Amino acid sequence: INQLKKNLNFKLVIRNNSYFKIFIKKYTKSFSKYYYDYAPQYLKKTIHKFISSESSKQNSNYSQFTAVYFELRTRCNGTCSFCAASVQNEARPDILMDFKLYEKAILELAAMNYKGIIAFHVNSEPLLIKNLDEYISFARTHLSDAWIQILSNGKSLNSVNGKKIIEAGIDELSLNIYNDDLKAKLPKNIIKFEKEVLLKFFNKNQIYAGHKNNKPSGKFIYYNIFRRLLNEILTNRAGTAPNKKSNKSVLGNYGFCEYPFHQFNITANGNVSQCCCDLNFSNPMGNVKFQTIQEIWEGKKFTELRKNLLSGTRKTSSLCSQCDFFGLQTPPKNFLKKAFYYLLKHN
């Protein structure tokens, strides 16, 4: 910390002896390129909390969300032991989002000049949607600057639907390949897709790795394969993870969480969750059938939730109070860096 203070010329101010507020005095690109990337998670979390707090002062409705997730169908074909939406654990009704409802949401985002992420998963598998390409195409038509992402387990990917979603205009296809052996060969359907579709649509220099970034000029796709353990133990997902029990002795210590400040999750019946960990949308912030997206985002439920998280408590939410998610994604480079740049330039 002392070295950071010296090199970056910033001061730490303790408020109510509960958390640090960071005031940046001088803009340096070296901070974001080095110190932010390698800073401890708690320091990153403090930075994000400060950014969110400052945003709330400048705009009573907080900054706009950066990612909209559509759960088009409440189903997954995965068998992950850590997820209550997996085949062996699924207890939700099977609901498919009406296309008219989807159109309403996309047109509202277009009217807002939305340029963030559009994705088609919450706790679901997007490639189970037979006409997924139609949903993608509609979003691409009306949100030309948005980043359209497909995150899939790859089980239902084939040359036919793979070709359709690429032609419809996705920017990114990321595959989580779950297996007990992280060195196992890729599934045959993935190899076939790469050979018959991916490498026929794109030259190798048009295929990038990673997530949302500035769009390259010309033809491109971001393509990722992440090897994941089928029986991995992650967070308790607000108490819903089948393979991890909540540790009540530590649940009150996590405090601030970034999710309700940049996520907007819509499930098949139009309900909006407070975050992606609310598997059953049990505490809806609103419903896009009856309200606008902006009304929900700026509504009383979201506002109160954010205020409580900024004060460092999760106890006022039944979901948050039993969640052991640290409160910050890893690595959180894109969103936080952009927000950090903004603060540096405007202070």
Q: Residues of each region from the PLM?
A:
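Short, small/polar residue-rich loop motifs at catalytic or cofactor-binding pockets
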Residues: 258-260
